[in-house]
Amino acid sequence: MPAPNVAAPFVIAEIGCNHGGDLDLAKRMILSAARFCEVDAVKFQKRDPATLLTPEQYNAPHPEPRHAFGASYGEHREFLEFDIDQHGELARYAAECGVVYSTSVWDMPSAKAVVGLAPPFVKIPSATNQHTELLELLCAEFGGIIHLSLGMTTRAEEERIVALFRDRGRLSDLVLYACTSGYPVPFEDICLMEVRRLREAYGEDVHAVGFSGHHLGIAADVAALALGAQYVERHFTLDRTSKGTDHAASLEPDGMRKLARDLRNVAKALTYKPVEVLPIEQAQRDKLKWRA
């Protein structure tokens, strides 16, 4: 049986909002992810809180006050936002560090702004993967690869997404992510076999299948690779005890570095023997093998 061609996975450190609205901290995180962790890409998030939130949601208190960066939830979200010029600065800094910049886009104003930056890829989060106008905009105006998470998404919704991309001639530019939307996700809810299901259902048509994890540790990510994930995304922080709701389900630099290392090593190991007795085995065979 021929050896499968298992490419090294593309590893994404999701900085998201773990920078706490601090541009200098965001740059330190990029540097750590690129030089120490040796990931392939760093990813942020771009939102327009006034567009995403109703007045009631905007003016409500943060549901977890100890993690709030503002008097209301809307002010909290505004505090964590970088404007598009700052995103451009982060993209340039990432390039200097030798790592790809990307961001999730949550709404129309954010998507229109990020399209102008022309990153290699953008991400549609699970929360907005049914925002048809947003998907249409990216299909029409964004020339790069479009990543999309399928957390909290029904099969019917998933099929509508795939049909839209197929109808717009962009299915080959789509990366579908198996994902469970929870922070953190217990192991029994990770549902890794979704990676295999997506590969079997769409693997011949989409650009790739990925895995976006919000669990603890790195074992599940390596298993996702073995099941066919070509992109692996994990939240990244410099300190899991920092203020903010995403830090607890994030990897610190040591963990992200080990994840990138283990994924690349396991990718090398995912093969059949190309010959019945490997060269590395021959000396031991000559010395130890029982001869009938």
Language-model features, listed with the residues they occupy:
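Catalytic cores and adjacent flexible loops of soluble metabolic enzymes
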Residues: M1-A292
